[in-house]
């Protein structure tokens, strides 16, 4: 029986939101349109816009909403205002008048890759996004300000697999650090690998690190169990986890075809051997026996070709 894959981010999000336990970890996520863009930029300073179908961080964009206050226009009263001393009863009211005379200006910063663009209105931002979206389904998600390692944002990948007893088991956590100037941490986008301890320990004490590790291991299992209710042939998932500035974990995305070879680059080789053992058991990786039989068959096939040619 083949391993089930689910490519739609929106489909997976809807299923996960049905679990009260898992939903607490999911940032506000909606299907993209003009009205939703307006609402999300009002609610959150950062928002990420990403394709419903996509891998390796391709197509991900970030919108940052920037609020500033314009200076009040100068007038002939400026000299008179300079004569108002701090002790004057008019000083406080004059200061309040200056505040009310200024007005808030909102601009929008759009970033994709290392490129940044600025738009003075929401309509212009939406038009720029539509040109990149090109009619495809995109999602808009509340942006989580990531913890940083050496001034570079990072996130975590939690791997959960079916074990040899056909139960869900979280088998590994690795860290990914974004390349300078990038908004994504994906290795294909120039990010680099790190261990969970290397990234988290500077922000949390040892007891906090262990508590977070246990929480993520449980979250991996809860997430897999919830997804399996709708997709019964799932065998493995990779969860992209953001840690906000307080150390709170958030689920950014769940991948049903997670990369496993990156775990082999980490120091814990025993964990990697277990990951591969489970992947072989449920059919993700070929078994050693199959590899051996294939290799043995190749010389025989070539030998028969030689005989047929000789005839």
Where do the protein language model's features map onto the residues?
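C-terminal active-site "lid" helix and adjoining low-complexity regulatory extension at the edge
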Residues: 1-5, 204, 211-214, 218, ...
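A conserved helix-loop-beta module that forms one wall/lid of the active-site cleft
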Residues: 1-66, 92
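Phosphate-binding site of ATP-dependent enzymes
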Residues: 44, 73-193
């Amino acid at each position: 029986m083949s391993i089930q894959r689910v490519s739609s981010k929106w489909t997976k999000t809807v299923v996960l939101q049905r679990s009260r336990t898992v939903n607490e970890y999911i940032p506000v996520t909606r299907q993209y349109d003009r009205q939703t863009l307006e609402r999300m930029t009002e609610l959150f300073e950062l928002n990420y816009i990403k394709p419903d179908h996509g891998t390796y961080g391709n197509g991900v964009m970030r919108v940052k909403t920037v609020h500033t206050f314009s200076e009040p226009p100068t007038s002939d009263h400026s000299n008179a205002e300079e004569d108002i001393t701090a002790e004057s009863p008019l000083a406080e009211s004059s200061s309040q008048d200056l505040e009310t005379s200024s007005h808030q200006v909102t601009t929008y910063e759009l970033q994709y890759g290392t490129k940044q663009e600025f738009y003075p209105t929401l309509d212009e931002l939406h038009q720029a996004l539509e040109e990149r979206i090109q009619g495809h389904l995109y999602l808009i998600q509340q942006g989580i300000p990531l913890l940083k390692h050496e001034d570079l944002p990072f996130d975590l990948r939690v791997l959960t697999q079916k074990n040899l007893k056909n139960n869900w088991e979280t088998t590994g956590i690795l860290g990914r650090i974004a390349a300078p100037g990038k908004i994504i941490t994906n290795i294909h986008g120039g990010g680099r690998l790190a261990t969970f301890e290397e990234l988290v320990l500077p922000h949390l004490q040892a007891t906090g690190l262990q508590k977070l590790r246990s929480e993520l291991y449980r979250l991996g299992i809860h997430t897999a169990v919830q997804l399996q209710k709708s997709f019964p042939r799932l065998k493995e998932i990779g969860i992209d986890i953001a840690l906000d500035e307080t150390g709170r974990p958030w689920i950014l995305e769940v991948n049903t075809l997670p990369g496993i070879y990156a775990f082999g680059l980490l120091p814990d080789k025993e964990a990697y051997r277990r990951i591969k053992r489970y992947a072989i058991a449920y059919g993700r990786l070929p078994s050693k026996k199959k590899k051996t039989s294939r290799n043995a068959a190749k010389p025989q096939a070539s030998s028969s070709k030689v005989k047929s040619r000789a005839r």
